[in-house]
């Protein structure tokens, strides 16, 4: 039985183990993460403030109606001097003095006030802040959703690569085990030197150690993905891309940078932070110090009881409708200081926006260029893998006829394993870099994940 036969056996064994696990695709992992990831749950809860803030903004310019009412015990004494009195049949009198007295009486009162803002720059700025804050909540939720999507893809392919590494190592292990048995048998027959036996056994011990480490790595990656998706780690099995789509590479790099200007969540959130600071400055500017309201009021105060002159009662009814102007005359420099502080914060936010634009553009360039180079790397590694397999076949045949040593066979087997893993890693990098590119431009959504999910399902 040759090396290639053992390789086929190893592949069948790995396929059996995979069938006992729950093979999930990328979209299934994403759907599980939506309802399970704790960080995303926090962002989704925060997203709930969006509509209430929009309602608050709309309510700021609606009428405000207030009713106050009260009842209790009290006293009411008045003394009037120098009053003028005139009445039918009583003539006219000047310098009249009169008093009223209620020392222990019951009181009740009510007042109804309606106010409609007409001119209030501070209120207008507060309204804009509420609307911007609602937009910011939307962006924070969108950024968290995109971050989770990227994180799921990275953790998913971390597991897929760990499982592939374990598969390749187990394949090598079986091949070297078979070779070690063959070397011992041939040594006992005197057909090979003892060094061939030692070389194969040393290589076997090394691979066994690598397999143990790879098994631990698989369990670790399973646990991480399980924590994100809520699926059982014992049942997880991730798929690898059968082919790699270059659909996102069809868009030129400069177009990606341009789209990031308006789509990047980081840039958009920092832009809103600057606008919020500018609205805060408007609240304390000179033009915002004056406000004009339409106001209507009606009220009644009543008290009745006994006093110095016997039983008595007093009622006062009032009402008015008109305009009310409010102008702060002196605030001790508080308003100007708050305005200056807000403007400095706006300048800081503008600088952060410029920095974010630069960093996003740099990241897009690096990612896009890596993708362009990665396409050629995948092609080169595919050819290298085919060459390594042909070399292994030739080396195995040469070993059987005595032209190649056991060490040559082991090295050829190592080359095939290394080429397989390098190609797999290159394909995964191409997928992840395209997902990262979409995230940088704020374009990462389920449609992007579906592109690469189809590539995985095509070969499974």
Residue ranges and their predicted role:
Residues 1-9:
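Bacterial N-terminal signal peptides that target proteins for export
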Residues 15-18:
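N-terminal signal peptide c-region/cleavage motif recognized by signal peptidases
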Residues 21-70, 76-77, 116-117, 131, ...:
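Bacterial Sec-pathway N-terminal export signals of envelope proteins
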Residues 24, 145-259, 370, 374, ...:
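Periplasmic alpha-helical coiled-coil/stalk elements that build and connect Gram-negative outer-membrane
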Residues 31-41, 48-63, 99-104, 111-129, ...:
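A glycine-/polar-enriched beta->alpha junction
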Residues 42-57, 144, 148-167, 178, ...:
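Amphipathic alpha-helical coiled-coil segments
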Residues 68-112, 241-250, 282, 295-331, ...:
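Small/polar, glycine/serine/threonine/aspartate-rich low-complexity segments that form flexible
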Residues 75, 422-460:
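Acidic, low-complexity, intrinsically disordered peripheral segments
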């Amino acid at each position: 039985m040759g090396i290639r036969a053992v390789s086929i056996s190893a592949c069948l064994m790995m396929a059996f183990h995979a069938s006992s696990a729950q093979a999930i695709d990328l979209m299934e992992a994403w759907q599980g993460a939506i309802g399970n990831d704790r960080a995303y749950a926090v962002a989704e809860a925060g997203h709930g403030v969006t509509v209430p803030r929009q309602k608050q903004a709309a309510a700021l310019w609606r009428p405000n109606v207030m009713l106050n009412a009260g009842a209790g015990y009290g006293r009411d004494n008045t003394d009037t001097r120098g009053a003028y009195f005139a009445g039918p049949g009583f003539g006219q009198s000047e310098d009249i003095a009169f008093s009223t007295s209620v020392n222990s009486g019951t009181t009740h009162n009510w007042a109804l006030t309606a106010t409609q803002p007409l001119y209030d720059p501070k209120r207008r700025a507060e309204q804009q802040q509420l609307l911007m804050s609602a937009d910011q909540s939307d962006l924070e939720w969108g950024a968290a959703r995109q971050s989770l999507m990227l994180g799921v893809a990275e953790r998913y392919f971390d597991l897929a690569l760990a499982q592939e590494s374990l598969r390749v190592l187990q394949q090598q292990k079986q091949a070297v085990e078979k070779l070690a048995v063959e070397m011992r048998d041939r040594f006992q027959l005197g057909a090979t030197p003892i060094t061939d036996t030692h070389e194969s056994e040393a290589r076997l011990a090394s691979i066994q150690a690598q397999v143990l480490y790879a098994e631990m790595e698989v369990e670790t990656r399973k646990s991480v993905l399980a924590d994100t998706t809520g699926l059982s780690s014992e049942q997880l099995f991730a798929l690898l891309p059968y082919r790699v789509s270059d659909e996102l590479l069809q868009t030129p790099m400069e177009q990606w940078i341009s789209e990031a200007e308006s789509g990047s969540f980081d840039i958009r959130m920092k832009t809103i932070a600057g606008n919020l600071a500018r609205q805060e400055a408007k609240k304390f500017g000179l033009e915002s110090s004056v406000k004009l309201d339409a106001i209507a009021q009606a009220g009644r105060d009543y008290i009745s009881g006994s006093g110095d002159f016997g039983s008595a009662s007093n009622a006062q009814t009032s009402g008015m409708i008109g305009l009310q102007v409010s102008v702060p005359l002196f605030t001790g420099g508080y308003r100007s200081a708050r305005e200056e502080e807000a403007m400095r914060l706006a300048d800081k936010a503008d600088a952060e926006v410029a920095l974010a634009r630069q960093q996003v553009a740099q990241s897009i360039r690096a990612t896009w260029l890596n993708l362009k180079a990665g396409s050629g790397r995948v092609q080169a590694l595919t050819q290298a893998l085919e060459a390594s397999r042909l070399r292994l076949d030739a080396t195995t045949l040469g070993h059987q006829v005595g032209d190649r040593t056991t060490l040559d066979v082991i090295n050829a087997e190592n080359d095939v394993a290394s080429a397989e893993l390098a190609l797999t890693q290159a394909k995964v990098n191409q997928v992840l870099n395209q997902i990262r590119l979409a995230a940088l431009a704020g374009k990462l959504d389920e449609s992007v994940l579906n592109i690469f999910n189809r590539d995985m399902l095509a070969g499974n």
